[in-house]
Each structure stands twice: as structure tokens, then as C-alpha cells.
Amino acid sequence: MRIEDLNIDSVLICTPAKVASASFLYSIQPSFSKKVQHRHCLETLKNTLQGENNLIITGIRNPLDRNVSYFFQHCHLEHHNDFKTSANNYEGEYCYVMPREELLETDTLELINLFFSHQNHFSFNDWFYEFFEITKIVDTAFDKNVGIQIYSLPNNNYLMVYVYEKISTNLNFIQSFFNIKEFRHDNNSSILKHKTKYKTFKDLIVLDDGYKTKLLNTPIMKYFYSDEAIEEFHRKYK
């Protein structure tokens, strides 16, 4: 199967952020002649699925990794972002902590304290529970071994869901499906200015069992990940 077989008019990349969604945007956009949007707003997802001939792309990631990456990505933004859910009245999240230049000079343990002081730790769950309500895919099994799946929705709409951790094993499928020569992994932490600070932060942060359980032991994670993968995520952080 390839994207042209779906007979769609537009692509909406709609994710909870920090799941490589920008990589899909920059990889697809040059070769796809029709409309491509990149959002994190579930109201946009809902409105799109009321139309027809759309492909939705959504990704999921270990939420512990995602939360750390989200903190580093948004801590300098002095406005509400596009992470819009019914839980925040579709107003987005305010994540400002400090200018990005200050982040590089701030003690890592102080950054960890600032990370825990913000209010957005469990909005990942809000996003996906509402996502399930909108898409109604929960009764269709997801292939956890493969880690990428296309669902057929009403009105010739389609939903592609991918697991972030399995992108590398699905590169051939992704490149073939979208008729692209290379999948560009943008926003890779290893090439960002704050890569050393980011790595030290992840090495030093301690996430207690309550924090990890609230994000990992959920119907969301059990739908997309095997028990073994979830247990591995638990062990990844002290």
C-alpha cells in the first residue's frame, strides 16, 4: 500500500508533541503535492475527521522520555502552545521556565526541580484518552510487534499510528508508503545545542514509582506496547 492508493486530499500530522512528528512533516511535505498540516490540537483532529479524504498521522512514545524532551523543547516559549485538549479548554499549555540561553548555564539539579514544578506532567494521558474518544479505534487491536498501523475510518479517512521507538525498524515501510527516499529525523537531541545538558538531566533525574505508574500503567500504554516494553520503560529511570 502507498499513500496514493488512499485517494486522500490532505494529511494532518496530529500528535502529543515530541514523538518525531516534525520528522514526518519535513519528510513528507516536499513530495506530497496536497495539503499537509502539523498540529497538536485535538479540536483540529475532531474537525478534520468530520470531513472526508484525510490521512491522520499520530505517534506515541514512552511518556517519561517524552516529558523530558517536551520540557527542553518548550521551556523558553512565553505563550501557550498548540497542545490543545478538552482538559485545557483547547487553550494549549504554558510551559515557560527561562530563555533557552539561560538553560545552558543553569545547574542541572536546579533544572530538575524546575521540571517537577510545572503542571503538565500527565497531560499526555489527557491527550490520548480524548484521542481514543475521537477516533474510536480502541476495539481494533494494534500490532505491538510491528509498531505501525493504518486504520480505515468513516468518510474515506485513514489513521496511521506509529510507535516512536520502532521508527527505525519501520523505515522501509514509511519510505515506501510516502514515496520518499529518506526519512529525516529532525529535532534529534544528539545534534541540539543543549545535548550535553539534556543527557546529564536524564542521567540525574529520579522519577518515583507513583510518577512512572501514572504514566505507564494505563490503558493507553497497554494498547500500544507489550508488557515487556512497559516494564523496560519503568526500569529506564531510577
Predicted ranges, named:
Residues 1-238:
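Membrane-interface amphipathic segments in extracytoplasmic regions
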